[in-house]
């Protein structure tokens, strides 16, 4: 196997091992030694691939958001395949958000932990919130936003609905975060 392919596989093993441990036990409670052991590597290998625990936490957070979004979208697409109105698709999106957090309560805890995660001064400009909002400002609300717009177009949603306010309230409800200042 080529060295670069092995390196990429090892990086993914570390990310997946760390993700599982971070979600089940928390970031602070999980050491690099434990992650390395779970990934079948040495702690030095983990540091060689990521440099710092903060950099690993960032890579894991990005990957977790992708995994969350892809899983959510697959379940949402299945849920809406026979629905006709934007209103019904919006309700389905909200039901899927709710179902996701009920089915995966550890995701909610992990999200809260990551939004309050403080990097070390050596981490530089790593901004965990920014990574989260890249997804929650775009990918995550897309099904609901699109459904609301379709609902306005098909008459199943009132045309005077403030869609931005609706999406903000929905995001707040499903993330447990109040971002109004």
Where are the predicted features?
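Hydrophobic/aromatic-rich alpha-helical bundle segments in the mid-to-C-terminal region
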Residues: 108-113, 130, 152-181
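N-terminal intrinsically disordered/low-complexity leader segments
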Residues: 1-9
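Generic hydrophobic, amphipathic alpha-helix propensity
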Residues: 10-19, 35, 60-64, 68, ...
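Hydrophobic alpha-helical connector segments
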Residues: 59, 74-106, 163-170
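Helix-turn-helix
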Residues: 2, 13, 21-59
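Short coil/turn segments at alpha/beta junctions that flank glycine-rich nucleotide-binding fingerprints
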Residues: 24-28, 104, 154
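Amphipathic alpha-helical packing segments from all-alpha helical-bundle domains
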Residues: 66, 70-73, 119-154, 164-168
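Amphipathic alpha-helical segments used for helix-helix packing
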Residues: 100-127, 180
């Amino acid at each position: 196997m080529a060295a670069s392919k092995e390196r990429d596989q090892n990086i993914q093993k570390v990310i997946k091992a760390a993700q599982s441990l971070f979600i089940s036990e928390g970031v602070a409670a999980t050491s690099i030694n434990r992650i390395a052991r779970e990934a079948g590597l040495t702690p030095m290998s983990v540091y060689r691939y990521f440099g710092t625990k903060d950099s690993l936490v960032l890579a894991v957070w990005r990957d977790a958001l992708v995994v969350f979004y892809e899983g959510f979208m697959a379940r949402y697409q299945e849920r809406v395949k026979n629905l006709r109105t934007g209103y019904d698709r919006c309700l389905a999106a909200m039901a899927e958000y709710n179902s996701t957090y009920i089915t995966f309560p550890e995701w909610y805890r992990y999200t809260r932990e990551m939004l309050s995660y403080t990097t070390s001064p050596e981490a530089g400009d790593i901004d965990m919130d920014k990574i989260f909002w890249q997804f929650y400002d775009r990918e995550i609300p897309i099904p609901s936003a699109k459904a609301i717009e379709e609902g306005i177009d098909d008459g199943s949603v009132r045309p005077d609905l403030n869609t931005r306010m609706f999406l903000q309230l929905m995001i707040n409800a499903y993330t447990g975060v109040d971002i109004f200042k």
